[in-house]
Curated annotation (Swiss-Prot):
Component of the DSB catalytic core (DSBC) complex, composed of at least rec12, rec6 and rec14. The complex interacts with mde2. GO terms for biological process: meiotic DNA double-strand break formation; reciprocal meiotic recombination. It comes from the Eukaryota. Despite weak sequence similarities, may correspond to the subunit B of a rec12-containing topoisomerase 6 complex specifically required for meiotic recombination. Retains some of the structural features of the ancestral archaeal Top6B subunit (AC O05207). Required for formation of the rec12-mediated double-strand breaks (DSBs) that initiate meiotic recombination. May be involved primarily in the early steps of meiotic recombination. Belongs to the TOP6B-like family. Residues 199-213 have a biased composition (Low complexity). Residues 197-222 are annotated as: Disordered. This is Meiotic recombination protein rec6. Keywords: Meiosis. GO terms for cellular component: mitochondrion; nucleus. It comes from Schizosaccharomyces pombe (strain 972 / ATCC 24843) (Fission yeast).
Length: 260
């Protein structure tokens, strides 16, 4: 039994390989399909696969590679459609696992060549991908289900899921772009330096304005007004003016008396 857990969506997949599985009995896939409505409660699903290539495995493979989208459950569905929906659930979980790895390793590079390398690495490291890859590489399959065709199909589906989940931030690493973070830090440092230079230049301009203005005496004597001294100055000016007028009058009188 192989068990793989996807922590992001809580899906647990169990793969059982049994040699004594009788195809005449009820298929375990039927049991999975009967729990279609309970899937969102994060139940465990058991998938029984015969190690030998059989018609059931071929149907499972074709449904796995061709039926990518979910079908909402309706009443009066035949068991074959239930089987298809059960396989779609497995396929969706597998695709999410691929997208999570791609988003961590290379968030913006969904290139076919890079995806092919990632798929080959996952085939050796991941149990789910390895099982599907071994089924795909068997000689009894049709040419339309070769590994290159499957990779292209999975690439398209991964790209679709990536665009759907881009805004939801469902997978770790999608929005973590080192180049973008570095550019943000550089812009922040540049803004800080510019603000610092602006503040220093504004302080320098203020100091120049203060130096160019006339000095102001801040002593207490300069700020107080001496009323007595001002009155003495006014009186002295008035006295001088009176003396001048009197002296001029005396001069005129002297001239008149002399004329007499």
């Amino acid at each position: 039994m192989h068990r793989v857990r996807s922590a992001r969506d809580g899906i647990v997949l169990k793969y059982h390989f049994k040699e004594d599985w009788d195809e005449t009995q009820n298929s375990p896939i039927d049991c999975i399909a009967s729990s279609r409505l309970k899937f969102w409660k994060r139940l465990n699903f058991n998938i029984y696969l015969d190690p030998e290539v059989s018609n059931q495995n071929l149907k499972l493979l074709k449904t796995l590679t061709l039926h990518c989208d979910f079908q909402s459950p309706k009443k009066n569905l035949t068991m074959s459609k239930f089987k298809a929906m059960a396989v779609e659930l497995i396929h969706e979980a597998f695709l999410k696992h691929i997208v999570s790895i791609l988003s961590k390793e290379c968030p913006l590079s969904f290139q076919p060549s890079y995806y092919s390398k990632m798929f080959n690495a996952m085939s050796n490291a991941n149990i789910i991908a390895g099982s599907i890859s071994r089924i795909l590489t068997r000689e009894s399959l049709d040419k339309s289900f070769e590994q290159s065709h499957f990779q292209l199909l999975m690439y398209k589906k991964c790209k679709l899921i990536y665009t759907r989940t881009l805004r939801k931030n469902e997978f770790d690493g999608i929005h973590k772009f080192p180049d973008l973070e570095d550019s943000k830090q550089k812009l922040q440092v540049a803004d800080d330096e510019e603000n610092k230079q602006y503040s220093e230049s504004s302080l320098l301009d203020d100091s120049q304005l203060l130096c160019s203005s006339p000095p102001v005496d801040s002593t207490e004597e300069a700020r107080t007004c001496n009323v007595e001294e001002d009155q003495d100055e006014i009186l002295s000016v008035a006295l001088v003016t009176t003396d001048t007028i009197l002296s001029s009058d005396n001069f005129v009188n002297d001239m008149l008396s002399a004329a007499d």
